[in-house]
Amino acid sequence: MERLVIRMPFSHLSTYSLVWVMAAVVLCTAQVQVVTQDEREQLYTPASLKCSLQNAQEALIVTWQKKKAVSPENMVTFSENHGVVIQPAYKDKINITQLGLQNSTITFWNITLEDEGCYMCLFNTFGFGKISGTACLTVYVQPIVSLHYKFSEDHLNITCSATARPAPMVFWKVPRSGIENSTVTLSHPNGTTSVTSILHIKDPKNQVGKEVICQVLHLGTVTDFKQTVNKGYWFSVPLLLSIVSLVILLVLISILLYWKRHRNQDRGELSQGVQKMT
């Protein structure tokens, strides 16, 4: 009696695939992750950047560096053996305010424009080497707004100026008929930008008593600045010239009358003196 034996070939491809899948799972499970968060803070206020090592690996030292064009610059380190060590260039400017080898926080006491940029936190871990994360700090300046108006010869100029960092945007909330708008942008050495918008209103009398609204957009927030145009005094050039000419004429007539009066008085006194002598 013959027996039929079927031999199944061993699949090397399936074995290799299984090995690669298992290796990928292990690597993903063991992958080290550093969690950071970018911050935006106002100029000349404190600011903090945080880093968190999201695994159970043991860190030996934590280093904070500032990213620069050529190479990162060491700022401060922390370890259990040496504590906090701040580089001379950053003394009295920063400190590590959360001491730990898993979670670390640096704080700037009074941020300036030079502090804006990106920073790296490096965890020197046992078995994984240096694991880094990056957090960026953005510095902003709140808008300083000026709103005023001025009557000219035959029109009304309303000016709204906003200075901030980053550059603000200026809008108007007024009727558009008979109104022209011009905008000028100026960058300052301190990093702020001024945006000045001027409304040219051709019929100023119709704007008297009405409210003008200047809207400033900065960092996603719109703020309204309001002002009511009060009655002003404006003259046309011909009218102004006529008034000036009339005033000059009156002054000349007054001088002439004054001169004639004194002349007559002098003649009268002279004639009286002659009569007495005779």
UniProtKB/Swiss-Prot annotation:
SMART domains: IG, IGv. Residues 260-278 are cytoplasmic. Residues 142-232 form the Ig-like C2-type domain. Residues 1-30 form the signal peptide. It is a single-pass type I membrane protein. Residues 31-141 form the Ig-like V-type domain. The chain crosses the membrane at residues 233-259. Keywords: Cell membrane, Disulfide bond, Glycoprotein, Immunoglobulin domain, Membrane, Signal, Transmembrane, Transmembrane helix. Costimulates T-cell proliferation. May regulate myeloid cell activity in a variety of tissues. CD200 and CD200R1 interact via their respective N-terminal Ig-like domains. PANTHER family: OX-2 MEMBRANE GLYCOPROTEIN. This is OX-2 membrane glycoprotein. It comes from Homo sapiens (Human).
